[in-house]
Design a protein with these regions (language model features):
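Non-heme di-metal
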Residues: 1-167
Length: 167
């Protein structure tokens, strides 16, 4: 049970590392000051999530994935690409990311061992914040991403999660 909790929390920790890269990449390169402010605000909440996952991994004597630097760089690059396309789908990218993250968090909560109340509590708190981020993007004018981008994001995240679960 501890091993399963450790693996799932490692995946969620990686997700928060990616969130830092994604939102920092977007914030650094967007020209829209309103969006930039929102992105940096979201970054602060994501940093809290990262700290929560990090602390829980420590309690479980768990390891972080060795791929975190790669995932961060890839996410930062995606953030830059999204920022460069701000007129067409930057906010949609945020909304879709948070939608997929919320689904993943719900799955993680259900997969955790029944008695791992602490990890479940952390992920439930994070899920509430992620839904708030999704709503914020929608409220400030996000546009739905093309299905090809949404599907690519989903496939890429599944690959990353599978690798991170084990390494």
């Amino acid at each position: 049970d501890v091993k399963k909790s450790e693996s799932l929390m490692r995946v969620n920790h990686m997700g928060e590392v990616c969130a830092q890269g994604l939102y920092r990449g977007q914030a650094a390169f967007t020209k829209n000051t309103k969006v930039k402010e929102k992105l940096y605000s979201i970054c602060e909440e994501e940093k809290t999530h990262l700290s929560m996952c990090n602390s829980r991994l420590n309690e479980l004597n768990g390891k972080r994935t060795i791929f975190n630097p790669v995932w961060y760089l890839a996410s930062f690059t995606l953030g830059v690409i999204a920022a460069r396309n701000e007129k067409s789908w930057q906010l949609g990218f945020i909304e879709e990311t948070e939608r997929q993250v919320k689904i993943h968090l719900d799955e993680s909560i259900n997969m955790l061992p029944e008695k791992d109340y602490k990890s479940k509590k952390i992920l439930k708190k994070i899920a509430v914040d992620e839904e708030k981020h999704r709503k914020t993007a929608k409220d400030i004018g996000s546009k739905k991403l093309p299905d090809s981008i949404r599907n690519s994001m989903d496939i890429l995240s599944k690959i990353m999660k599978k690798i991170t679960y084990h390494v």
